[in-house]
A protein has these predicted regions:
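Periplasmic peptidoglycan-binding/tethering modules of Gram-negative envelope proteins
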Residues: 70-152, 157-170, 200-231
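Q/P-rich, low-complexity intrinsically disordered regulatory regions
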Residues: 155, 183-189, 205
Length: 231
């Protein structure tokens, strides 16, 4: 399963490298982080390894050509964002499949995957376009399965997603909603905190009591950091 996740992410990275907004795939190191570099240009925590935004060098560009380049940049960024959403959906699917052979009450259940419109401004033309980006997804995890290998594998998929989103976006959040009765009975860990990815990006872990959540269930919602800025 782990090998499958790595292979899948390698395919997505290669695809995003081919459609990069700028020449971010010139070296092997840049190729391995091309997706992150693409998104770093429109987040609040750009990666200095990715270089600066593309400039025209002061040359005048015909209006039609400028509009075409602008549209192409938006299209390529949207393609990268779509890949990020597809990869998130794949990891959610893996988290659910990992527990499908357990008894029904011990299986994880996929919740909604949400995207949101994000205004992105083209740094060369000043034109702003609304792009669609991954926002969050959730998976309900039964307490009865804790300690089993299947539960651990499902959690690994969710943690992988949170770490990848943090590296791509600058940060991510794991929101864990817990049933009131489980919190009162001390059946769940209610501690919040922050961890870091291998690249030093923060993954915030928040716990929240939800009176409407069924007893014996923790709802894990993986939220991506904000995208804002210019191409």
């Amino acid at each position: 399963m782990k090998t499958h996740r790595i292979a899948r992410w390698a395919q997505l990275t290669a695809a995003s490298c081919a459609a990069a907004l700028i020449s971010g795939c010139a070296t092997m190191e840049e190729a391995s982080t091309s997706f992150s570099c693409m998104l770093s240009r429109v987040t609040s925590s750009p990666d200095p390894r990715c270089g600066g935004p593309v400039t025209t060098g002061g040359a005048r560009t015909p209006a039609g050509s400028a509009a075409g380049s602008q549209n192409e940049r938006f299209a390529r960024l949207q393609a990268a964002l779509d890949q990020e959403t597809a990869h998130a959906a794949e990891l959610q699917k893996q988290a659910v499949q990992a527990m499908q052979k357990l008894p029904v009450r011990q299986r994880s259940v996929a919740g909604p995957l949400r995207t949101r419109p994000v205004p992105i401004t083209d740094g060369q033309s000043g034109v702003t376009s609304q792009l669609q980006a991954f926002s969050s997804l959730s998976v309900d995890m039964p307490l009865a399965a804790k300690g089993r290998g299947e539960y651990t594998r499902a959690m690994d998929s969710l943690k992988d997603l949170a770490n990848e989103l943090a590296d791509n976006r600058g940060s991510s959040t794991i929101l864990v909603e817990q049933a009131d009765a489980d919190v009162s009975a001390g059946r769940v860990n209610t501690s919040s905190g922050t961890t870091q990815t291998k690249n030093g990006k923060p993954v915030n872990v928040r716990k929240k009591v939800d009176s409407g959540l069924p007893v014996g269930i923790e709802r894990y919602t993986i939220e991506a950091g904000e995208i804002r800025g210019k191409l």
